[in-house]
Swiss-Prot record:
It holds the Pfam family Hexapep_2. Gene3D superfamilies: Hexapeptide repeat proteins (2.160.10.10), MurE/MurF, N-terminal domain (3.40.1390.10). It catalyses: a UDP-3-O-[(3R)-3-hydroxyacyl]-alpha-D-glucosamine + a (3R)-hydroxyacyl-[ACP] = a UDP-2-N,3-O-bis[(3R)-3-hydroxyacyl]-alpha-D-glucosamine + holo-[ACP] + H(+). This is UDP-3-O-acylglucosamine N-acyltransferase. Pathway: Bacterial outer membrane biogenesis; LPS lipid A biosynthesis. GO terms for biological process: lipid A biosynthetic process. One of its GO terms (molecular function) is N-acyltransferase activity. It comes from Bradyrhizobium sp. (strain ORS 278).
Length: 355
């Protein structure tokens, strides 16, 4: 069976042209006419591929690679095998990504699955909805009353957009995504299977008649250039809005509770859980599976390591980790101290056993 390809193949290109595009230089300019037909990882590259190397963890792969050429920094240039053309770059990975973005522009954002012919006859669209020219609505999508959708937006198969929702221009609403009570800016990519704008988790707990539901009357506001990973859930606010700031990138399967405010250009890795009424500043990075308690403030530029549990405010530019999270230097010192204590106790027990 032929190997399936999901993205367009780049055109063949000489190494001289590639070096110019990547703002790199050939160690041997006589190799400038050599033709490259694609990009590949070191361990999968063939003679017609360009690879990159910038991490000594992959030194063995570099030594065995069959790549025709390799982007590499001057400090690692001597490690490149003789049969591989050296393409010298100060930041090889950035240069590689720059080339990949040009060669595979169709992979930068989700494309229509069922063609680009506008509105599918299998879609259901309320007559009061307003769709600008160039909107694509795929089969079995449902668009409710008074919805507004901007030009260039794709609504994926089986997606549901509830009444009065506003979606900006050049957005992607992934297949089987559900959006309600939300205002969404321009150039927002929402991957398949997301739920946005549903009730927040608000109750008065353990009353005389059990748990009393608190009305959730806020909205979700997603600003421009945000990306929301597959399976992510974003609850609407109870009184104030849940806000996702401009340029923030959210990984798959993240839970964002009601009333949360996330600043601009934040990074949230997979399976994070954010409890309600958090305030997260700009340029914050949260590792995978971080959990943060409610009503906290995470300062601008803070970073939290993966699988940490946060129960206290974090100051701007703080580097925290652990369970419960604390400044990473303190956390590492405590880990070392505990390991030393266990080691000493083990040694003492052995000595006592000999007696």
């Amino acid at each position: 069976m032929a190997q399936p390809t999901f993205f367009q193949s780049p055109p063949p290109m000489t190494l001289a042209a590639i070096a110019a595009k990547a703002k790199a230089e050939l160690a041997d300019v006589s190799q400038g006419d050599k033709v490259i037909k694609g990009l590949a990882a070191l361990d999968e590259a063939g003679p017609m591929h360009l690879a990159f190397f910038d991490n000594l963890k992959y030194a063995d792969q570099l030594a065995r690679t069959n790549a025709g050429a390799c982007l590499v920094s001057p400090r690692f240039e001597a490690r490149v095998p003789g049969h591989v053309v050296v393409v010298r770059a100060n930041q090889p990975f950035r240069a590689f990504v720059q080339l990949a973005r040009e060669f595979h522009a169709d992979a930068l954002r989700p494309q229509p699955w069922f063609g680009d012919d506008g509105i599918s006859p299998q879609a259901i669209i309320d007559p009061t909805a307003r769709l600008e020219d160039g909107v694509i609505v795929e089969p079995l999508a449902v668009i409710g009353a008074h919805v507004e959708i901007g030009a260039g937006t794709i609504v994926g198969a089986g997606a549901v957009i509830g009444p009065h929702v506003k979606v900006g221009r050049d957005c992607n609403v992934g297949a089987r995504t559900v959006i309600q009570c939300s205002l969404i800016g321009n150039d927002v990519l929402i991957h398949p299977g997301c739920s946005i704008g549903q009730d927040g988790y608000g109750f008065i707990f353990f009353g005389a008649n059990g748990h009393t539901k608190v009305p959730q009357t806020g909205r979700v506001i997603i600003q421009n250039h945000v990306e929301v990973g597959a399976g992510t859930t974003i609850d609407r606010g109870s009184l104030r809005d849940t806000v996702i700031g401009e340029g923030t990138k959210i990984d798959n399967q993240v839970q964002i509770g009601h009333n949360v405010t996330i600043g601009r250009h934040c990074l949230l890795a997979a399976q994070i859980g954010l409890a309600g009424s958090l305030t997260i500043g700009d340029n914050v990075a949260l590792g995978a599976k971080v959990g943060i308690n409610n009503h906290l403030t995470i300062g601008d530029g803070a970073q939290v390591t993966a699988m940490s549990g946060v129960k206290d405010d974090i100051p701007p530019n703080g580097r925290w980790g652990g369970f419960f999270a604390k400044p990473t230097k303190q956390w590492f010192r405590e880990i070392v101290a505990v390991e030393r204590l266990v080691r000493d106790q083990t040694a003492t027990s052995r000595d006592e056993g000999r007696e």
